[in-house]
Amino acid sequence: MFQKVGDAEFVRGEHEVLKLWDQQAIFAKLRQKIAGKQPWSFLDGPITANNPMGVHHAWGRTYKDTFQRYWAMNGRDLRHQNGFDCQGLWVEVEVEKQLGLGAKSQIEAYGIDKFVHTCKQRVLKYAAIQTEQSIRLGYWMEWDDPQQLRKLAAAIGTDETVEFSPPKLPETVIRDTAEAIVAKLGNPDWGGSYFTFSTETMRPSGRSSRNVLNEEKSIGAMT
């Protein structure tokens, strides 16, 4: 009466689904279908890009993705923007271990500017890895190209001109220093993940010019 059921190859099945989504541009079609509809949003605490994603991150991201898919299926428009936390001890401590530094005086001797650039390199490196992990997880977001993030990581802190194509402008090639490009990652015109980097250019109010730019664009995007 019953036929023998073959072994369930879950990993192969997952790859087949991901390939289907990519070949048929399912996520892009969904975003096109819900564009301009009543928005639905929630505050997503950004993951710190200091190491590869852990199981606990995947657990939380699965819940977030489920909620977003549910509301998209109900015809609500979503921003679909991932965030990366780039500042604070989570990043700095890992860089201290990476460089073999154990005291504030050693960091100062190494050079604050060099230390900051090394922190940014680490963030971009692991943002690329976490992006790949999240895509593998099936997490639907407007992702940056991981290879472009790695290219920025390699050039940050130098005067080298880098080429970058934002997710929302895939046919556009932006040529600038990695520092200048990184300062604009995630802005509404470019799309892609938001990075909590700050710049050294400050306005009289004490806020960085990039933060003010993002605030202005975010307000415009939300109205």
Regions found by a protein language model. Name each.
Residues M1-T223:
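N-terminal, positively charged nucleic-acid-binding surface of large information/translation enzymes
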